[in-house]
Structure formats: structure tokens, C-alpha cells
């Protein structure tokens, strides 16, 4: 019996030693340090796009739009290694149409409308998604690069009620 206990104890110690030895591993960590991309010009940091005055009668059906109002994001001091940029617009999506910015709530706010952001080719920009079909926009290093966009009102319902139109969005840049 004593002999069996010694063998059992020897086996247990051997297993413990084996499991401690099998825990050795190596983790390799790597990465790259890249040039800084571009600087957003001060006139593109915080600005307002004035969608002008529009009559509620301009929106007779769902999907009717106001005239597009152009705006731009200017990038300067682009490094030599920066060849392109993707831009994502982020904001609260309209409940009726998630491609539109929801109007800020308030007592005098218009209803039945959202704000649509359009790219340089007048195509709607998908909100809150940097990689949703976004194309790389070529950049010229060491020059000002102007990224043209537009914004317009778009009806989300057949009936539009007049009032104030306000919404906020931020933009995110990804450089290549």
C-alpha cells in the first residue's frame, strides 16, 4: 500500500512539472509608424451649412428634396506619403430614413424632413459607416485638397410641417 502511494505521488508531481513546462510561449508584437496624414483647415473644423428658406409646399411627396447647398472640407499640409482619404459623416439617423440626419428636436422644429449629405458626384453619403462603399479620394501631397459635398432637405413623409431645421454631424477621416 505504501509503495502504491509513492508511485501515485510520483505520477502527480510528474504531471505538475509537465504542465508547468508546457506554458512557455513567445508573443511577437509589430507595427508601423506612419506619417501624420493631413491637417483639417481651420475653416473646415466647425462650420454651418445654411439650407436657406424653403416652403413646405416644395415637398409634395415623400422623397422630395430642396436645392442642394454646397460645402467643402479643406485638408492642408498633407504629408508626402499620404495618397488618399475616406470621409465618414456621423450623426443621429432619421427614424423614417436612416440615410438622413435626424432634425434636432425642439418646440419650433419642422417635421417630415431629414437632411441628406451628398458627395462630389451628388450621390447620398451613408451615415455612420466609414467603409460602406466609400471610395478613396486621391490627395495631392503638400497642397490644399478640397473635398466637395452638398446638403439638402429631403421629405420623409407626405406631409411636411414648417419650422426650424437643425441637425449636427461630425466627420471622420481615414488616410491612406
UniProtKB/Swiss-Prot annotation:
Disulfide bond residue pairs: 38-78
Keyword Cell division: no
Gene Ontology CC, one term: pilus
Sorted UniProt keywords: Disulfide bond, Fimbrium, Signal
UniProt superkingdom: Bacteria
UniProt similarity note: Belongs to the fimbrial protein family.
Signal peptide: 1-22
Biological processes annotated in GO: cell adhesion involved in single-species biofilm formation
Subcellular location: Fimbrium
Designated name of the protein: Uncharacterized fimbrial-like protein YdeS
Species name: Escherichia coli (strain K12)
Pfam families for the chain: Fimbrial
Amino acid at each position: 500500500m505504501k509503495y502504491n502511494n509513492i508511485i501515485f505521488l510520483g505520477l502527480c508531481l510528474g504531471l505538475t512539472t509537465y504542465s508547468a513546462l508546457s506554458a512557455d510561449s513567445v508573443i511577437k508584437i509589430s507595427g508601423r509608424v506612419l506619417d501624420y496624414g493631413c491637417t483639417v483647415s481651420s475653416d473646415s473644423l466647425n462650420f454651418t451649412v445654411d439650407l436657406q428658406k424653403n416652403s413646405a409646399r416644395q415637398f409634395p411627396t415623400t422623397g422630395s428634396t430642396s436645392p442642394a447647398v454646397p460645402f467643402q472640407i479643406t485638408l492642408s499640409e498633407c504629408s508626402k506619403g499620404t495618397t488618399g482619404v475616406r470621409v465618414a459623416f456621423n450623426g443621429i439617423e432619421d427614424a423614417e430614413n436612416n440615410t438622413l440626419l435626424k432634425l434636432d428636436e425642439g418646440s419650433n422644429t419642422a417635421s417630415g424632413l431629414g437632411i441628406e449629405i451628398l458627395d462630389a458626384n451628388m450621390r447620398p453619403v451613408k451615415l455612420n459607416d466609414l467603409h460602406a462603399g466609400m471610395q478613396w479620394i486621391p490627395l495631392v501631397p503638400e497642397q490644399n485638397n478640397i473635398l466637395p459635398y452638398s446638403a439638402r432637405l429631403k421629405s420623409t413623409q407626405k406631409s411636411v410641417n414648417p419650422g426650424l431645421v437643425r441637425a449636427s454631424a461630425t466627420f471622420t477621416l481615414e488616410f491612406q
